[in-house]
Regions:
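Short Cys/His-rich zinc-binding micro-motifs
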Residues: 830-849, 853
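Hydrophobic, well-ordered secondary-structure elements that form the walls
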Residues: 454, 502, 744, 780, ...
């Protein structure tokens, strides 16, 4: 703590001090609220809504509203909000993050701002990390809201469309982050307004905000449909991947090394970079692949699919581990969430990786998916008018919360002092010695009836420790992705005297561990971490399971020099020093240098992960602006707006585009290329083709005016063919939706291809993000033009006897939350994409749009 903080207090302490007068005001209203009958207390909700209509603000109502909720909590649940919980509620209402220790009652805190903000009638979303917590909180905390006359809903994974709509229409809705994001995307794919389930995004309270906005923000939400590709190539690549030999690289290839022409000496058929989770074929490996598939050059454009799929197969075998990244259950590959250790049913890795794992595990290979809609959590949650968050650990990522989400973090003091003892890390040379030490520590604690919670990173480790404890005769519970259903029950019993629980990562987060009297007298819950996580914050979350509400407790991490964190990110020099010390077997190593190395390794990874998330956001910001325009256009169509004016504007714009492209007043009309003009415009708008006679002696604008008049007249004739004007209006909406959806889905793929290729701009000393923005702008304009032209082409050529029905462009087959690292590489097109402002490939020296681009439009 610096001198300023010692004198004036930390920023959080100053913020809490500023809020205290409000807390005192809420406290002072307590006697008045106690005097009210249940009916009078409920009547306060109607009174608050009326006062809002008369011009008062939520801030004006806050002290009374919080006092009402506090009294309702006491009457309904027998739980009265502590002063520190009132502080937390105020922070959440202000759109900030309240860092509250485990066991401080974050769930109860959320009832305060959710009630206050629900009074506006626009809906409040309380966001949790899984269905169990959403359902539990809706049932328990929802009683307070219902007692006060508000409606409460919950959205669960298996709910139908009408059930979701009813839940979102409630005053307070409990929902998981994934369901919320996917419902937003699905709402922007519906073809009738009645199919929408969500209202506008007004205010949300995010529980475990660090898990949702930081940990899960590295990968976007993706809704996918099935592509028509065969699965045979995955099987062939899987067979080949098992025949290839893993080698080593002399050093890592960096961009600077590539520019300087440094050579990397590689052995074997492929090398694996575990840090960045990337697999690369060596020259020897490339030759083997070419021989296997009987092709001349793997790098040829027509072989991109083979190149992509063999890389996926190698990743599946060398970087994706069974019972760590995924489990096999009922002939299916199920993803395990890397942050919680929970199974994510229905989620599939994107870009063919899931199919590669299916081939590896010899289960039925499902067809590859095509991205239909996608959004990042950063951009989704930034759509809310206001958002607040709660967690036990946020200060380490405060800068990211402020920079990306414009939310600052305020540490809320605990209701009772924390008396948990956090011991120094116990470090061993090998994993075997480390696990022996963990088992000895569990046996020792168990002997004195002290409950133990052992945190592991992988399912494999939890099962190994389980076997070792069985040999020692220690009765215990295992909580990992395989036993998901029993999660809450097992966690709630973990504080009983003599209980031993092994939990993968933060499984069971959100469920309180309460101690019995015997356990409390035996020094409380003992937390044992079997490995340091990549993030210090997740280590702190594990520690925070012990010592709730002033309970006693202990924590210690057990580490070996063979752990992934030390092996991949620790200093090699340091590792060599300790290896050469000749430490006796099972002897614990203690050294300040080692503690610093662990801390530095974690900081390195945190910085790296922040870079990944920031990079994702920089690129997705461009996509987000385009997505906003497209979704706004779709919503106007869904709202049943009269599209006649929009169609007329498309007619004018299309005529303008081709007149300006083909004609010039600087050139005599006799020299105009009428064949080119007729070839591009008449397939879209069936006007009479222009002839030398019809343009003779006329200026460009005169031609323009005549063409527009004729095009509008033709459209009016088309209108007259319909018995009812509304029939054509509905047809316009049907055609527009079809064209928007079809072109937007192709555009998503094009943008991903562009993003993967744009990284090469860095070699030319150009900023890849700037290059991406410029190219994306051209592509978007090209897509808009294409939507307009396809819409007009279909409307001008439609026949009245055709039945008008809306239909989805592509069928949704699933959702995807890809937690795999490494860049996503979409299906490549064989032809090279040429953008409007690129030099024309024919070599004329003109821009593509002014040369061959014209002809291709036809």
């Amino acid at each position: 703590m610096n001198m300023f903080s010692k004198v004036f207090g930390t920023r959080s302490q100053r913020e809490v001090k500023r809020i205290m007068p409000l807390v005192e005001k809420i406290e002072s209203l307590r006697p008045d609220m106690q005097k009210l009958s249940d009916e009078e207390l409920r009547g306060k909700t109607r009174e608050f809504k009326k006062r809002l209509e008369e011009g008062e603000t939520l801030d004006d109502l806050l002290p009374e509203a919080f006092a009402v909720v506090r009294e309702a909590g006491k009457r309904v649940l027998g739980m009265e909000h502590f002063r520190v919980q009132l502080i937390g509620g105020i922070i959440l209402h202000q759109g900030r993050i309240a860092e509250m220790r485990t066991g401080e009652g974050k769930t109860l805190v959320a009832t305060l701002p959710s009630y206050l903000n629900a009074l506006e009638g626009k809906g409040v979303h309380v966001v949790t990390v899984n269905d169990y917590l959403a359902k539990r909180d809706a049932e328990e905390m929802g009683k307070i809201h219902e007692f006060l006359g508000l409606t409460v809903g919950v959205v669960l994974n298996d709910m139908k469309q009408d059930e979701r709509r009813a839940a979102y229409n409630c005053d307070v809705t409990y929902v998981t982050n994934n369901e919320l994001g996917f419902d937003y995307l699905r709402d922007n794919m519906v073809i009738y307004k009645e199919q929408l389930v969500q209202r506008d995004l007004h205010y949300c309270i995010i529980d475990e905000v660090d898990s949702i906005l930081i940990d899960e923000a590295r990968t976007p939400l993706i809704i996918s449909g099935q592509s028509g590709k065969s699965t045979k190539l995955y099987e062939a690549c899987d067979i080949l991947a098992q025949q290839l030999e893993r080698g080593e690289a002399s050093h890592e290839m960096t961009k600077m090394a590539a520019i300087m022409g440094e050579e990397v000496i590689e052995t074997g058929d492929f090398v694996v970079n575990e840090k960045d989770k990337i697999v690369n074929l060596t020259e020897q490996g490339v030759h083997k692949v070419e021989k296997f598939f009987n092709i001349e050059n793997l790098a040829d454009p027509e072989n991109l699919e083979i190149q992509h799929n063999i890389t996926l197969a190698l990743r599946a075998h060398n970087l994706m581990h069974k019972d760590q990244d995924y489990v096999v259950k009922d002939d299916e590959i199920l993803i395990v969430d890397e942050f919680t250790g929970r199974i994510m049913p229905g989620r599939r890795y994107s870009d063919g990786l899931h199919q590669a794992i299916e081939a590896k595990e010899h289960v039925k290979i499902k067809r590859e998916s095509k991205t239909l809609a996608t959004i990042t959590f950063q951009n989704f949650f930034n759509k809310y008018d206001k958002k607040g968050g709660m967690t036990g650990t946020a200060v380490t990522e405060e800068k990211e919360f402020r920079d990306i989400y414009a939310m600052d973090v305020v540490e809320i003091p605990t209701n009772r002092p924390v008396i948990r003892v956090d011991h120094e890390d116990a470090v061993y040379m090998t994993k075997k010695e480390k696990f022996n030490a963990v088992v000895n520590a569990v046996v020792e604690a168990h002997a004195k009836q002290q409950p133990v919670l052992v945190g592991t990173i992988t399912i494999e480790t939890s099962e190994l420790l389980s076997r070792m404890l069985k040999r020692q005769g220690i009765k215990h519970n295992v909580l990992n992705a395989k036993f998901h259903e029993l999660e809450a029950e097992i966690v709630s019993q973990a504080g009983q005297a003599g209980a031993v629980t092994i939990a993968t990562n933060m499984a069971g987060r959100g469920t309180d561990i309460k101690l019995d009297d015997v356990a409390r007298n035996a020094c409380g819950l003992m937390i044992i971490g079997t490995e340091r996580h990549e993030s210090r914050r997740i280590d702190n979350q594990l520690r925070g399971r012990s010592g709730r509400q002033g309970d006693p407790g202990e924590s210690r991490f057990y580490i070996s020099l063979e752990d992934d964190l030390m092996r991949l990110f620790g200093s090699e020099r340091l590792m060599k020093i300790f290896t050469s010390l000749g430490v006796a077997e099972n002897e614990q190593i203690e050294h300040k240098m080692l503690s610093n190395a662990i801390e530095k390794a974690q900081e390195k990874i945190e910085f790296n992960n922040f870079g990944i998330r920031k990079n994702l956001l920089d690129y997705d910001q461009v996509n987000n602006e385009q997505r906003e325009i497209i979704y706004k256009e779709r919503r106007q169509v869904l709202d049943g707006e009269n599209m006649r004016e929009a169609i007329y504007k498309m007619i004018q714009d299309t005529v303008d585009t081709y007149v300006d492209m083909c004609f010039s007043d600087d050139v005599d009309s006799e020299e105009w290329d009428l064949n080119e003009f007729n070839g591009v415009l008449t397939p879209i708008i069936p006007i009479r083709p222009l002839t030398d006679e019809s343009v003779k002696g006329k200026k460009r604008d005169e031609i323009r005016h005549e063409l527009k008049e004729e095009a509008v007249k033709l459209y009016e004739e088309k209108e007259a063919e319909f018995p009812e004007p509304e029939q054509l209006r509905e047809l316009e909406r049907v055609v527009l939706l079809k064209c928007i959806d079809s072109k937007w889905m192709d555009h998503i793929d094009d943008m991903e291809i562009l993003r993967q290729g744009i990284g090469l701009a860095a070699y030319g000393q150009r900023d890849p993000v700037v290059e991406y923005k410029m190219s994306a702008f051209d592509m978007f304009n090209e897509m808009i033009t294409s939507i307009q032209e396809d819409t007009l082409r279909m409307l001008y050529h439609v026949h009245v006897e055709q039945k008008i029905e809306r239909e989805q462009v592509a069928k949704v087959t699933g959702t995807n939350k890809d937690d795999s690292a490494g860049p996503k590489k979409p299906v490549q097109r064989k032809e090279i994409k040429v953008y409007p402002n690129d030099p024309c490939p024919c070599g004329s020296g003109k821009k593509y749009k002014q040369c061959c681009g014209r002809k291709n439009k036809a």
